[in-house]
Amino acid sequence: MLMRKIRLNISLTILFISFHYGIYLQVEEKDDIETQEITIVKSNKPIISNIFKIRSNPIISDSLLEEKFYIKYDHISVPVVSTFIPNKASPLKLQKQESSFLYNSYFSWGYGNQSQALIDFASMISIDRNQSMGVDFIFSSLGNQENKILRSQQNYLAASFLHLFKTNNYRVESSFKFDRRHINFYGLYSDYDWTNIPSFRPSLIDPEQNLNYLKINSNWEWFNSIVKKIRFNTVLTIDYFDNTEQLINFDSEIRLPVFDFYLELKPNLSYVNTNFVSSFRQNVPLSNQTSLLNLDFQIVNLGAKTNFKFGTKVFYLLGDSIEKTNIYFFPKVKFLYKPSYSSLSTFLEFDGDFNLNSFTTFSRINPYIFPSLKLRPTNIPYKGRLGVKNSFNSGLEFFLAAIYSRSESYPLFKRLPYVVSNNNLSYNMATSYEVVYDRLDQLGLETGFLMRFNEHNKFSINTKYVNPESFNEISAWNLPSIEIDFEANFRFFNKIYLQTNGRYIGRRDSAYHPVFLNAEFFDSKPEIKSLDAFLYFSSRLLYQTKSNWAFFFEFKNNFGNNYSRWAFYQDYNNNFLLGLRYKFDIIF
């Protein structure tokens, strides 16, 4: 009985203490409302004692009869003593930052001396996250030169459309381009009195030549496939005299991993179809159709210190050809060694090549070629380069290489003689060039230097010196012994951009045929006329305003005693052009 009373008293005492402790916690919660602690307990986390209990059926309350329960919070304002001491220094002045937006389009136009004109428009618009479409248009013109008997103005027009599609696996770039180059055969001999030549009637001569090129390209590139690239392009060329030429080229690249190496295959197909209205001497139509199949087979190793490629090139010639054989084999070796302790690497390249020539290719190099050519492929049995190159972290790169090549049928631009029975055609006035093929050996040096100061400031210069030696012709016509190309880009104060490029062409020999008044001498050996070296220089200065407008100034000049790439075709000198550029967005 006594034990029962003791247990009852202990139970009542524990119950009393628990009750007062609960009241004390509630008071503490009301007094300290600013500090709340929330404990998140995962739902339906049974303990061992609840596992075997019978769960009661859930009861859904009647929302029509039960009143909504509203939660009210009582906010108690508590005075706070601030300990913040303000800084006595003067406040910083906010400076407005210049906005640098990227635009997808721009339009430029300019005008300068010698009747210069320039119109330039370009736009690249994103259709969606994978596709982009672009358009580019440019037109430039130059007026007549002084003291020229025949017209000498020229202009250039180009319009192209581009479509780009890219994903994580591949990239497709397709383009459609039309460009037209309008020139004149005005390069008459300057040491003749043309008024005393009866067969020369300038009032009846039309020196015009229009070279029109229509080009379609489609380039496919895969990132994670054995087929790396597929390229297709076709070119249709039509000139002022209704001569036509069609080029088709298809090539691909396949790379197969084999152990620690790669097996690389590059099949290629080239096709040339040329139709000339009239030949130079016989005045009869001249046509040529040639196809070339090519397969490059090589093994590639890309190592940490040593990279090498070795294999073979196979060519098979089809169609109209005067070559001795239709099948050609050439070795191909590329080797590069870079030690781990140095940034200097040594490289060796040795291979051969076989190329189809075309009126399209020649006219882009020399627009004053005769509008009828004898086309032959160029056979290069071997060519090699041996040298060193270096790349520093500071942005400096350079290379030095010794070069040698032998060509069995190298194309040379040789000046044609004056034709007495010229039919008032300007290209018969000793103003045009034919293409002759000769064996040519070239031995020399190549150097290159590139300095990248940062993203917008860089300077590069490349030099090539060779000693061309021909075998059948008395000189390697119009091949300079030294060529120097340089380019520089600089930005100042984030507003001023300077672009400069130039080219130095050394001395070279040109064929010179004396003019005979009453007889044709097609087979007479020409004299050698040495052309002086000259330097072509072009510079563009652009000032970008805070708005979308920019002002630019262009300067072009030639330096030398006889500043012309081709004999008696004096280039324009001291050209100035001032223009505006406006950037904007095109949104669909």
Question: Can you say where each PLM-predicted feature lies in the sequence?
Answer:
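Short loop/turn motifs that connect adjacent beta-strands in outer-membrane beta-barrel proteins
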Residues: 95-102, 127-130, 166-172, 222-230, ...
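Membrane-embedded beta-strands of outer-membrane beta-barrel proteins
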Residues: 121, 159-161, 216-220, 250-254, ...
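Exposed, low-structure sequence patches enriched in small/polar residues
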Residues: 102, 107-110, 305-588
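Surface-exposed extracellular loop regions of Gram-negative outer-membrane beta-barrel proteins
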Residues: 125-147, 264-268, 272, 287-319, ...
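Flexible loop and strand-edge segments within Gram-negative outer membrane beta-barrel domains
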Residues: 142-154, 158, 173-231, 235-247
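Outer-membrane beta-barrel transmembrane domain signature of Gram-negative proteins
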Residues: 201-219, 233-304
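N-terminal periplasmic/intermembrane-space "pro-region" immediately following the signal or transit peptide
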Residues: 6, 21-97
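Outer-membrane beta-barrel translocator/receptor signature
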Residues: 87-89, 98-147, 151-157
